[in-house]
Regions:
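A solvent-exposed interaction/effector surface
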Residues: 2-186
C-alpha cells in the first residue's frame, strides 16, 4: 500500500482516541435527535464576511495557523455559523488554562457558558444541502416539544477532518433552546 493511501485510511478509519483528538462534548448519534447541555468552554473564533459555504472564506486556515503557531492540540468538533461565516475551534483543557494566548487580527478568543441545544446527528458530506435537510428535521421535532423554545440561530457541528470521505463524515446541526416555563395548573 502506498503511503498516501495508508495515511488516508488512517485518517478515515482510526478511532479518534487513537488519533489523540480531544472531544469537547459527546456526539449525537447519527440519525438521532436529542437535547444536550454543552459545557462552558474557551474558544478560538475566525470570521469572514462571506457565508460559511462560500468557497475561499479562509476560516479553517486562520484557525489552523493559530493553533499550530501556539502549540494548541486540535480538538473536535469544529462549529460553523453560516452567515456571515464563522468557524469555532474549542481549546483542549490544558490550553484553556494558558494565560499566554492572545487574540490576533485573524482569531478572536472567547469564553462561552454552558448552554442547552437541540441536536440532530447527520451522516454525509459537509454541505449546505445536508445542513438544510437536517435543520428541517430538527425544527419539525422541536415543533412537537412544547417544553422547549428556540433561543438563537442554528449552526453546524463537524466531527471529522476534511480528508474523511463524505459518506463516513459525522456532523450535527444544533439549535440553541431554553426550557419553557410549565403552564400554571388550573
Amino acid at each position: 500500500m502506498r503511503l498516501p493511501h495508508l495515511l488516508l485510511a488512517m485518517a478515515t478509519f482510526v478511532p479518534s482516541f487513537l488519533r489523540g483528538t480531544e472531544e469537547a462534548y459527546p456526539r449525537t448519534p447519527m440519525g438521532s435527535i436529542e437535547t444536550k447541555t454543552l459545557p462552558a468552554a474557551r474558544l478560538m473564533v475566525a470570521e469572514s464576511p462571506k457565508g460559511y459555504f462560500e468557497s475561499g472564506n479562509g476560516l479553517f486556515m486562520k484557525l489552523f495557523r493559530y493553533i499550530d503557531g501556539n502549540q494548541i492540540p486540535m480538538t473536535s468538533p469544529v462549529e460553523a455559523r453560516l452567515q456571515p461565516g464563522v468557524m469555532v475551534f474549542y481549546m483542549d483543557a490544558g490550553s484553556a488554562k494558558r494565560t499566554d494566548l492572545q487574540a490576533t487580527p485573524q482569531v478572536k478568543l472567547a469564553e462561552t457558558p454552558a448552554r442547552l441545544v437541540a441536536s440532530i446527528g447527520v451522516r454525509g458530506s459537509y454541505s449546505r444541502e445536508n445542513f438544510d435537510e437536517a435543520l428541517a428535521k430538527l425544527k419539525a421535532w422541536l415543533a412537537t416539544r412544547p417544553d422547549l423554545a428556540p433561543q438563537g440561530e442554528p449552526y453546524a457541528v463537524y466531527w471529522n477532518s476534511p480528508f474523511v470521505p463524505g459518506i463516513f463524515k459525522h456532523s450535527e446541526v444544533h439549535l440553541p433552546v431554553a426550557a419553557k416555563p410549565a403552564a400554571p395548573a388550573k
